[in-house]
């Protein structure tokens, strides 16, 4: 039996999962990581805590599975994207807190770029919108605000990276300073056409090239873990950003295949093959993966509020005590009776990108109950995904045959059925919902010879349930119209 170790470093926790070659889980370990918000719009984590939590769960998972590091065939890594870490190469110590992808402190810098007419240029080069979401603005802020950092960077003594870079640096005890291609594509610094750092953008952003890591393919043999770290060395042979890892783990290898991950937010990725497709509908173009000497691209739509809506029902309104109770509450009514929730608590993501939009709950009457609100909350998740898919299909002129789903909220049968109904597309839920971690493990296994091709990985994907569309066309159109009207009222230009 071949064991594969997946490291899944997310926004709220560090995890380690041990799989076999069939995708069966043999051990899981998890440790939460703290998030700090020292100022309005700032979101940070302790980079050293990220590393210490990750090494701790590796050791815990090995102990739980009753195996040794020498029994692991390969290590795969997946991570929260865009999050930015800088450190001193000489000491290996972080020079500042990790700036998390949700952080908005670079908003003014981004606005200045937009005012200077760089929006189209940045999209054509990187596939991304100018937004504080991406790493470039975070790095510029650090260079301008951390005392002595720019000098260290120009002297070649400082390093920048995303979370994959930081973990690999520590796993190899400073031997490797790299960034994997799908992660690099989220920095707003990599040219998607050349798959190299864009010198023109670096000059315009005043970022020293000496600070940047080497871009490597998703299936590169990076190095072995350092001697003495885990008892025996383990080859690091697969790295992917978390959403790209989920696309790979869902075996969405064919052009036109798509997955949607239901977590705190929603992230839909649509495989566009080896062709760069630049969106005309405010979606992101991203690198899906590089493996077996081939590059695959994707269109991505990011929705800010999904599982977070259920958390609001629990913590903000007190309608439920536990998130899992939302389906039971919502099922007490057959419809929302006209109640619509637009969950723009932090603005609207793709394809609207309206940071000033505000949440709206409308259509209520004296007969409205908490069950109607709970049902409207679940439907709001599906409506937002529908907006993303509509934009994707407009860009690609290609109908979606099926949508593969994962993430915690995909276990909600009511939500998945409504998602299928409102999309008019079958929704497929796999038996194993750890698609992100499995994607990293499978990529590592492909390089390590556990798998010889993508078909062998695809064979491990097993269906749990298909949710077929049941809603009549006129009802679907009516519901989408209700959503559209509520959305217009929530957007900033109408408040």
Curated annotation (Swiss-Prot):
The keyword Transferase applies. ADP binds at residues 11, 15, 264, 307, 408, 412. InterPro entries: ATPase_NBD (IPR043129), Carb_kinase_FGGY (IPR000577), Carb_kinase_FGGY_CS (IPR018483), FGGY_C (IPR018485), FGGY_N (IPR018484), Glycerol_kin (IPR005999). Transmembrane segments: none annotated. It is an enzyme of class 2 (transferase). PROSITE patterns: FGGY_KINASES_1 (PS00933), FGGY_KINASES_2 (PS00445). One of its GO terms (molecular function) is ATP binding. Its EC number is 2.7.1.30. GO terms for cellular component: cytosol. Keywords: ATP-binding, Glycerol metabolism, Kinase, Nucleotide-binding, Transferase. Sn-glycerol 3-phosphate binds at residues 11, 81-82, 133, 242. It catalyses: glycerol + ATP = sn-glycerol 3-phosphate + ADP + H(+). It comes from the Bacteria. Pathway: Polyol metabolism; glycerol degradation via glycerol kinase pathway; sn-glycerol 3-phosphate from glycerol: step 1/1. One of its GO terms (biological process) is glycerol catabolic process. Glycerol binds at residues 81-82, 133, 242-243. Pfam families: FGGY_C (PF02782), FGGY_N (PF00370). Belongs to the FGGY kinase family. Key enzyme in the regulation of glycerol uptake and metabolism. Catalyzes the phosphorylation of glycerol to yield sn-glycerol 3-phosphate. HAMAP family: Glycerol_kin. This is Glycerol kinase. The gene is glpK.
């Amino acid at each position: 039996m071949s064991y594969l170790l997946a490291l899944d470093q997310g926004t709220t926790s560090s995890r380690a999962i041990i799989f076999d070659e069939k995708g069966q889980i043999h051990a899981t370990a998890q440790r939460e990581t703290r998030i700090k918000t020292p100022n309005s719009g700032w979101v940070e984590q302790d980079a050293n805590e990220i590393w210490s939590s990750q090494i701790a769960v590796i050791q815990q998972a090995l102990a739980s599975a009753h195996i040794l590091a020498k029994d692991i065939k390969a290590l795969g890594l997946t991570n929260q994207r865009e999050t930015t870490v800088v450190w001193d190469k000489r000491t290996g110590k972080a020079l500042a807190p990790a700036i998390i992808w949700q952080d908005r402190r670079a908003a003014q810098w981004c606005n200045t770029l937009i005012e200077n007419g760089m929006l189209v240029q940045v999209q054509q080069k990187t596939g991304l919108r100018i937004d504080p979401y991406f790493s470039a603005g975070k790095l510029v802020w650090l260079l301008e605000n951390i005392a002595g950092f720019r000098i260290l960077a120009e002297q070649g003594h400082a390093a920048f990276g995303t979370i994959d870079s930081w973990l690999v640096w520590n796993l190899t005890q400073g031997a490797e300073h790299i960034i994997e291609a799908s992660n690099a594509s989220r920095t707003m610094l990599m040219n998607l056409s050349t798959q190299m750092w864009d010198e023109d953008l670096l000059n315009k952003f005043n970022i020293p090239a000496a600070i940047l890591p080497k871009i490597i393919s998703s299936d590169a043999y990076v190095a072995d873990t350092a001697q003495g770290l885990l008892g025996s060395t383990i080859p690091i042979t697969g790295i992917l950003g978390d959403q790209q890892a989920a696309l790979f783990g869902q075996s969405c290898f064919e052009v036109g295949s798509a997955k949607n991950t239901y977590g705190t937010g929603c992230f839909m990725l649509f495989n566009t093959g080896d062709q760069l497709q630049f969106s005309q509908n405010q979606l992101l173009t991203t690198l899906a993966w590089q493996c077996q000497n081939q590059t695959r691209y994707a269109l991505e739509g990011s929705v800010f509020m999904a599982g977070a809506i259920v958390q609001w029902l629990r913590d903000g309104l007190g309608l439920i005590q536990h998130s899992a109770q939302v389906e039971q509450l919502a099922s007490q009514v057959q419809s929302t009776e006209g109640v619509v929730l637009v969950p723009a608590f932090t603005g609207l993501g793709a394809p609207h990108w309206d940071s000033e939009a505000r949440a709206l709950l409308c259509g209520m009457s004296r007969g409205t109950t908490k069950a109607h609100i709970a049902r409207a909350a679940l439907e709001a998740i599906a409506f937002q995904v529908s907006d993303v898919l509509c934009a994707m299909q407009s860009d690609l002129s290609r109908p979606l045959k099926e949508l593969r789903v994962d993430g915690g909220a995909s276990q909600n049968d009511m939500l998945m059925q409504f998602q299928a109904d409102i999309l008019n597309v079958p929704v497929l839920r796999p038996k194993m919902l750890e698609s992100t971690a499995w994607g990293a493990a499978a990529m590592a296994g492909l390089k390590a010879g556990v798998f010889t091709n993508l078909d062998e990985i695809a064979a491990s994907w097993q269906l749990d349930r298909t949710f077929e569309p049941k809603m009549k066309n006129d009802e679907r159109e009516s519901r989408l119209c209700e959503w559209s009207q509520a959305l217009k009222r929530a957007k900033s230009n109408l408040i």
